[in-house]
Amino acid sequence: MRHYEIVFMVHPDQSEQVPGMIERYTGSVKEAGGQVHRLEDWGRRQLAYPINKLHKAHYVLMNVEAPQEVIDELETTFRYNDAVLRNVIIRTKHAVTEASPMVKAKDDRKALAEVENNDFEDAEE
């Protein structure tokens, strides 16, 4: 089986359906004997340019190991699902399990905010 990186963008009005979509897609990978190595829900983000007069979209990143038939099925599902605005499926040489720069930056910001908040509370005392 080959390794793939999949990113898809969902219509912002359909954000509440994203967990169900993720479950359905990961389920189809696992049913075929594949494996999900990384799954990141980046949430609603600003688009670089408008797509269908929309300025935001809900982003999801998945790194999977799956047979080609499953990837073809996912690609067809993305194509005919009106909620999916854009998608990209890239074959990779090996499994990627470490956090993406998007998640790392988000975690760094959270850690920095906690440190600043603790420093502020210490200064008040």
Swiss-Prot record:
One of its GO terms (biological process) is translation. GO terms for molecular function: small ribosomal subunit rRNA binding; structural constituent of ribosome. It holds the Pfam family Ribosomal_S6. Keywords: Ribonucleoprotein, Ribosomal protein, RNA-binding, rRNA-binding. GO terms for cellular component: cytosolic small ribosomal subunit. InterPro entries: Ribosomal_bS6, Ribosomal_bS6_CS, Ribosomal_bS6_sf, Ribosomal_S6_plastid/chlpt, Transl_elong_EF1B/ribsomal_bS6. CDD domains: bS6. Belongs to the bacterial ribosomal protein bS6 family. HAMAP family: Ribosomal_bS6. Binds together with bS18 to 16S ribosomal RNA. NCBIfam families: S6 (TIGR00166). PANTHER family: MITOCHONDRIAL 28S RIBOSOMAL PROTEIN S6, SMALL RIBOSOMAL SUBUNIT PROTEIN BS6M. This is Small ribosomal subunit protein bS6. It comes from Pasteurella multocida (strain Pm70).
